[in-house]
Amino acid sequence: MKKTIYKCVLPLLICILLTGCWDRTEINDIAFVVSSAIDKKKDQYRVAMQIPLVGQLGGQTGGGGGTAGSKTWYVDSASGTTIREANNKLQTSLSRTINTSHRRTVIIGEDMARDGVAPVFDILTRNPQNRLTALILVSRGEARDILNTDVQLEQFPAEMIRELAIIATSRPVFLSRFMSDLVEIGSDPYAPVISASKTKPGGKGKSNLKIDGLAIFKKDRLMDIFKDEHMTAALMLLNQARQPEFIVDLPNQMGQASIQLQKSNASFHAAEKNGKLSMTIEIRAKGIIMENQSTYETRENDQYYIIQKALNRTIKKDVISTVHRLQKLKADPAGFQDRTIRSTATTKNLLKKEWEEVYKDMEVHVVPIVTIEQGGVLYKTISH
C-alpha cells in the first residue's frame, strides 16, 4: 500500500518542480527597441527609441517601404539630467517594458559627440542587456531626426540605418570596437556619419537616409567629419575602404578616368630619423577602370601605364593630405602611436616624449603600389 502511495505522490512532487513559468513575461508586455538616438542640449540628455509595431508588420500590402500605408514603427523620446533618467522617463510613458537586447544601432547626435561620448558608452556597456554588437553612428544634426525619417526601401528606419552602417566600412564599427579604441592607448575611435536627405525623382522628393562622412574622434570627443577624398583616404589608412573610387586627372589636360580599387591594403613602418618619427605608409591595391573620359587608350600600352601612374599620384596626394589633417586635429584613428610603440626601429628616447609632440612633427612617406588589372572591354573612348 505504501509503495502505491509513493508511486502516486512522487510524480506530483516532480510536477511542482517542473512548473517554471511563475515569473514569465509575455511578449505582448515587452517593447523591443531596435534603435536608439542620444542627443544633448545644454545640460540635458535626450534619448529617443524606435520600437517596431508588430501588428503592422507582414501580411499587408500598399504603402512605401513595405508598409501598409501607416507606420510600422513608433518613436518616443524623453530628456533628463542623465541618460538613465531619460530612459526612466521614457518607461513611464510606455505600457510595455523596454527591452534593449535586440537593439542593433545607436546614433549619437553631432552636438553630443563634440561634447564627449563617455556618458553614452558608460550606460551602453554597464547594463548586460545591451548588445556590444550594436552599430555606432554619428548623425548630422540631431540624432532623433534620423529615427523619425520615413525610409522607402525598408520597413522601418532602424533596418535602413543598419544596412548603411554595414556597407559604409569593410568591417562594421560595433560598440565593442569603438570602446576598444576609446579605452586602449595607441588609437582613437571613428564612426560613420549618417544624415537625412531628400530623393530627387523630378517631383516632390521623399525622405531618405545616407552615409555622409566619417567621424574622427580624439579620445571621446568628435573633432571633425571627413568627406569625399579625405574620407576615402582615411578609410584606406584604416584598411576599412570598401571598393573606393578615384577620379583621376590625366596629364596634359587630356581628360579624366574613374578607377575603382577592388582590393587595397595599407601597411605601416615606423622609424626614427634625426630624433623625429618617420612613418612610411605602403598602399597596395588592384583597380579597374570604370569610366574613361580621356583620349588615352585603356589597353596595355604606354597610355595605359600613364593612367596607372596618374592613379598612384592621386592616391599619394590624398593620403598625405589626410594624414596632415589628422595631425592638425591631434587625432589618431589609424593607430600611428600603437605602431610606433611596437616598432623595433624607434628608441626609448623617442617613446618617452609626449605623443602629441611626436605626432605633430611626424614625417609621412606614402608609397602607393597600385596596378590596374582591367581596362574594360572597350579600349578606345567613343567620344574621342
Curated annotation (Swiss-Prot):
UniProt topology in membrane: Lipid-anchor
Keyword tags: Cell membrane, Germination, Lipoprotein, Membrane, Palmitate, Signal
Lipidation (N-palmitoyl cysteine): 21
Keyword Mitochondrion: no
Location(s) in or outside the cell: Cell membrane
Lipidation (S-diacylglycerol cysteine): 21
Pfam family, one: Spore_GerAC_N
GO annotation terms (biological process): spore germination
Signal sequence bounds: 1-20
Assigned GO CC terms: plasma membrane
Annotated family: Belongs to the GerABKC lipoprotein family.
Function of the molecule: May be involved in spore germination.
Name of this protein: Putative spore germination protein YfkR
Species assigned in the record: Bacillus subtilis (strain 168)
